[in-house]
From Swiss-Prot:
Catalyzes the synthesis of N-((2S)-2-amino-2-carboxyethyl)-L-glutamate (ACEGA) from O-phospho-L-serine and L-glutamate. It comes from Staphylococcus aureus (strain N315). It catalyses: O-phospho-L-serine + L-glutamate = N-[(2S)-2-amino-2-carboxyethyl]-L-glutamate + phosphate + H(+). SUPFAM superfamilies: Tryptophan synthase beta subunit-like PLP-dependent enzymes (SSF53686). Its cofactor is pyridoxal 5'-phosphate. Keywords: Pyridoxal phosphate, Transferase. Induction: Up-regulated under iron-deficient growth conditions. Repressed by Fur under iron-rich growth conditions. GO terms for biological process: cysteine biosynthetic process from serine. This is N-(2-amino-2-carboxyethyl)-L-glutamate synthase.
Length: 326
């Protein structure tokens, strides 16, 4: 056997996690804002963590075998992560998606060989989540040995982030953390990471960033275009009492946040990252200078070239929000 250095992994899956953290000096010069670059996971997003954790847990406990057919409703990133891992482990996968998935994400999922079921009808809230869930239930009833990942209700979702990025953040940041800011959709990442962070930094304030029009925190549903943030249902794994503050951001603000991040820091990240940047800009107007803020950048920008990085899309969102051109 050829001797390998510690830097050489046996599998691509071994490279999930241990993502770098950078301080956003240029964008937030009066505060210490540290961003964990979750888009540097091999599948391009933080969703690699729950995908790997849930599948490996299922295999370990006999819930997933070589004959299992994985099923999940996804807006893109988890679908990519599951497709990557399913390909490596030789498992069948069907992703239930909707028309708001970015064209790039859809192509990546298909390139990995996963089956794709596209729903077309929006649900009662104007989104597609409940329609996707109904399709999942239909597939579970018709496919033998099907296993539903069920990210909105699966406790393994938040546990993957608790043991993963949450632990890595605590190991990296030695000074007191004043605020942890994270986007929400399934709420697995904010629940898992914040629980780990609070163990070492009990005074940290947990700030959720949600999309305007999302119903997670009780707001009325309105039409949303940006995938990967917000939801048209309340996730079962959410514990609202653990969230100190919620900041809602619209699609236009999110796009501007993405563009500011690349202009000031050279970081090319996805739509929900723009939401985070916009939320932190709001947060710092009401907190002390020099506060330590920790956040995550969930996915890569190249998956949003037709969305937040499209001038045509930006103008459409600007018009929708009633913003006047200068």
């Amino acid at each position: 056997m050829i001797e390998k250095s510690q830097a050489c992994h046996d599998s691509l899956l071994d490279s999930v996690g241990q993502t770098p953290m950078v301080q956003l000096h240029q964008l937030f010069p009066k505060h210490e804002v540290f961003a964990k670059l979750e888009y540097m996971n091999p599948g391009g997003s933080m969703k690699d963590r729950p995908a790997k954790y849930i599948i490996e847990h299922g295999i370990k406990h006999g819930l997933i075998t070589e004959n299992t057919h994985l099923i999940e409703s996804t807006s893109g990133n988890l679908g990519i992560a599951l497709a990557m891992i399913a390909k490596i482990k030789g498992l069948k996968l069907t992703c239930v998606v909707d028309p708001k998935i970015s064209p790039t994400n859809l192509k990546i999922i298909k390139s990995y060989g996963a089956n794709v079921e596209m729903v077309e009808e929006p649900d009662a809230h104007g989104g597609y989540l409940m329609t996707r869930i109904a399709k999942v239930q239909e597939l579970l009833a018709t496919i033998d040995d099907a296993y539903w990942i069920n990210q909105y209700a699966n406790e393994l979702n938040w546990q993957s982030h608790y043991h993963g990025a949450g632990t890595e953040i605590v190991e990296t940041i030695k000074q007191p953390i004043d605020y942890f800011v994270a986007p929400v959709s399934t709420t697995g990442s904010i629940m898992g990471m914040s629980r780990k962070i609070k163990e070492g930094h009990p005074n940290a304030q947990i700030v959720a960033v949600d999309a305007k029009g999302s119903v997670i925190f009780g707001d009325k549903p309105i039409n949303r275009e940006l995938p990967g943030i917000g939801a048209s249902r309340v996730p079962e794994i959410l514990n609202r009492s653990e969230i100190n503050q919620v900041i809602h951001v619209d699609d236009y603000q999110s796009a501007l946040g993405c563009r500011k991040l690349i202009d000031y820091e050279g970081i090319f990240a996805g739509g929900s990252t723009g939401s985070i940047i916009a939320a932190i800009e709001q947060l710092i107007t009401s907190i002390e200078e020099g506060a330590t803020i920790v956040t995550i950048l969930p996915d890569r920008g190249d998956r949003y070239l037709d969305l937040v990085y499209s001038d045509t899309w930006l103008e459409k969102m600007k018009s929708r929000q009633g913003v006047k051109s200068e």
